[in-house]
Amino acid sequence: MLSPTNPATPWILAIALVALIVVMVIRASRKDKREYRRFKMLRTTKRRQAMFRRWVLQSFALFGGVSVVLLFLDAQFVPLLLAEVRTVEWIASPITQLILAGVLVVGAIVAVGGIIAARSETEIPSIGDVQALLPRNRAELRWGAALSINAGLVEELLFRLAFPAAIFGITANAIVAIAASIVIFGLLHLYQGVPGIVGSMLLGAVFMAIYLISGSILLAIVIHAFFDLRSLVLIPIVLFKVHLVRQGNGLAPKRPTAAVPAVVKPVDVAEATPTPEAP
């Protein structure tokens, strides 16, 4: 664990952070995009479930592992960054806390109620190229839930704790640390296209605000997981009734979906290449 008073600490953090970011951005710009294109060609649920399972395991290992390594190095900067931000009086005020609570409650009601109200709609707006991620039968729903919960956990630990703390340890600037972490979070959604990148940055800003105002990373994890569960579980169940489909060939639902799952996927392109297979 690096000490904030050690003059070598910023340099060590900078080397570690730059190396990690370069690797992750290269993966996102090359492997993620190519694999996602191939994933969209898969038609059998067996292959889709295998890919979902691989994404869950790889994401947990990669992003969870990076979080552990970075937090081991920069853990002492986590409370320092939070304390710096909360010196802004309105951020830590009880009134802001109440407003946040109200916004979260109303947001949850609108998120769920909007899906229920849209059951009869013929078209649901979407942000980013995310339709292929929708579960298409009961078995795939389980992987949708696993992806959502895993993303909520490892992505919040990485992009709301580990990365901002490391950047703060390098720059001693809370604004730079927060803004850079949000941008990195968005860029790692390259496979969703420009709309997906922008949408992910906006979501990252929301999750960051929840963490900074509440002071609780657990709350940010829960909200992130809830949002992804809405996209990858609730929408397929309510709009497409996929929970009633025991078997399936993996064909896409007839109607487009809504929402941007905030899921970053580590990938293995070679294993994702589809081959002809009977449904």
Task: Describe every region a protein language model picked out.
Residues I124-P279:
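Transmembrane helix-loop-helix hairpins at the membrane interface
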Residues G102-P125, E156-F163:
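Transmembrane alpha-helix/helix-exit interface in multi-pass inner-membrane proteins
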Residues Q76-L100, F163-V183:
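Hydrophobic alpha-helical transmembrane segments and immediately flanking/interface helices
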Residues V85-I109, A139-N150, E155:
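C-terminal halves and exits of single transmembrane alpha-helices
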Residues A19-V22, L62, V66, L70, ...:
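Alpha-helical transmembrane segments of multipass membrane proteins
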Residues V85-I91, I115-P135:
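Glycine- and small hydrophobic-enriched segments that form the cores of compact globular domains
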